[in-house]
Amino acid sequence: MIYEGKAITVKALESGIVELKFDLKGESVNKFNRLTLNELRQAVDTIKADASIKGVIVSSGKDVFIVGADITEFVDNFKLPDAELVAGNLEANKIFSDFEDLNVPTVAAINGIALGGGLEMCLAADYRVMSTKAKIGLPEVKLGIYPGFGGTVRLPRLIGADNAIEWIAAGKENRPEDALKVGAVDAVVAPEKLQDAALELIKRAVSGEFDYKAKRQPKLEKLRLNAIEQMMAFETAKGFVAGQAGPNYPAPVEAIKTIQKAANFGRDKALEVEAAGFVKLAKTSAAQSLIGLFLNDQELKKKAKAYDEIAKDVKQAAVLGAGIMGGGIAYQSASKGTPILMKDINEHGIEQGLAEAAKLLVGRVDKGRMTAAKMAEVLNGIRPTLSYGDFGHVDLVVEAVVENPKVKQAVLAEVEDKVKEDTILASNTSTISISLLAKALKRPENFVGMHFFNPVHMMPLVEVIRGEKSSELAIATTVAYAKKMGKNPIVVNDCPGFLVNRVLFPYFGGFAKLVSAGVDFVRIDKIMEKFGWPMGPAYLMDVVGIDTGHHGRDVMAEGFPDRMKDDRRSAIDVLYEAKRLGQKNGKGFYAYEADKKGKQKKVADPSVLEVLKPIVYEQREVTDEDIINWMMIPLCLETVRCLEDGIVETAAEADMGLVYGIGFPPFRGGALRYIDSIGVAEFVALADQYADLGALYHPTAKLREMAKNGQSFFG
């Protein structure tokens, strides 16, 4: 062994060729933490000092190559002063440059995922051979930053500015054939041939058959574009990417600006430009929020994984109630490998459920994301039925019938008699108490809530609701099944609205107050969309359904009358009475028309103003900032209450629930991180300015205590 560390080893293979292997001890993946970077420096120095070494193959001892930088470690660095952070970045980059400058040829053998710093390591090599099972990419923009280990310098010089901009600004993972096509890798081979292919390539470079120094040279020079070509490439890209990313996500455009600024410099000066821009981005609130989301997501996955130890494997599932929701659940289960029975009480429901699943599958086939054979396999995994005949072998049943407690209780009690004693029953309810529904069951310990969000195939969140008598086995099995379906489960305790709807309705409450104060709902929508929401509250209410919102509002008012009950009629009441139910019947706050593709498109409908007139009680002058505060303060305070009441266990879960469940602006990080960004004391003072609007705007005693003590939700 030439070098041996805890993350990296260097050993001789044959004929002066060595293997530099990443294999971080005690971890399932390789990542660039301080230990790995230090050992890479030592390994490179060792290779440089050994004149007998003729070539280097870089490999991985794990199923992945390198997943990138250890963000949990590096996020602390982002708090350092700018100059210190720039110096640290350049010091790390010198390690990659020293590797690139070795006086021998180098080949990266990419066996699995190589992302971020993992791909940047590969770019520092002279050649790259990629397994057909691998994927590569630079996803840093998803964290609000851009590549900081030379990615903005080497990639454009290797594959051209246009291709590099597309890779870096999109932040997606790229398949082997796409990587080969643009020249990001030199060869793609079957996994079992990877080592031999890398060895063959390095031998040909060592022998002089391949000129590795000529291959390396473009990465060390300025970008090979003249002034006119640069202007065309960069200005066009900046305009297009700015339109795609929007003003709240600066990283993609900043990456292009950095490539442009560094275009006329050689590698070392270009790396200085990259470091300066990287530090600037790392300090933005968007980066801090998006990195916070990433860390929260890791915490969520860790918590969900902990349930695996006691979870029962769901080999056969069932859904009660077909229709669009049942069809979506059936599609999601079958497409992820769990066969499912789809039961309804009539043929129409079955047809609707199958049509929904088929529509989703055809969409995937049309986009090239699924083969026709796979589509047939998934459809075969959905078995429609009008009876309970085959329910004796079902491991978990999702009840998805109408949102009515008596109907749900009757259906659940009925199915309980048709399944095994240990079958888990899960109710897909958005507002009804799980403990209440459990009263109809003989085995309430086997019963939980499993709240899917609509549309099921698109929304990543599933709330798994623990009732008073739900067992840990039932919770664990439902969490594991949700994960198997490709969802992000969050376990919450039972209360009206659970987490997401309990927090959403105070937001709608703020909206109702604004409309009753004479504020134009179109203006409110525009301001909240500019704030970062995917759609404004009026449009969201139309999409959810005015009738659904009306029912949910009443449930929440009954559950929390002190702050959610309003004796005055509001916009949702008059729209409901006028049978303007939203998108579902073509008119709500807006009117809806089908576009050329048959997709619903909202249009202005002046007639709604007459409908709303009776609930406009005053004409109040409010600023754009007021509108944001009227909307956001109730949502944030209810999130705080959910955490204090133990409905959700951690701040991370609360914030992720809102991002995944209702589209809370990711660049703001979630409600609790949003409070942190303002400052807890400042937020309490802000809420107090709106105290006259009612109890929804009154901070809790505990939040006031946090403000007094200078505390925050995230350290």
From Swiss-Prot:
One of its GO terms (cellular component) is fatty acid beta-oxidation multienzyme complex. Involved in the aerobic and anaerobic degradation of long-chain fatty acids via beta-oxidation cycle. Catalyzes the formation of 3-oxoacyl-CoA from enoyl-CoA via L-3-hydroxyacyl-CoA. It can also use D-3-hydroxyacyl-CoA and cis-3-enoyl-CoA as substrate. The gene is fadB. It catalyses: a (3S)-3-hydroxyacyl-CoA + NAD(+) = a 3-oxoacyl-CoA + NADH + H(+); a (3S)-3-hydroxyacyl-CoA = a (2E)-enoyl-CoA + H2O; a 4-saturated-(3S)-3-hydroxyacyl-CoA = a (3E)-enoyl-CoA + H2O; (3S)-3-hydroxybutanoyl-CoA = (3R)-3-hydroxybutanoyl-CoA. In the N-terminal section; belongs to the enoyl-CoA hydratase/isomerase family. This is Fatty acid oxidation complex subunit alpha. PANTHER family: TRIFUNCTIONAL ENZYME SUBUNIT ALPHA, TRIFUNCTIONAL ENZYME SUBUNIT ALPHA, MITOCHONDRIAL. Substrate binds at residues 297, 501, 660. Its EC number is 4.2.1.17, 5.1.2.3, 5.3.3.8, 1.1.1.35.
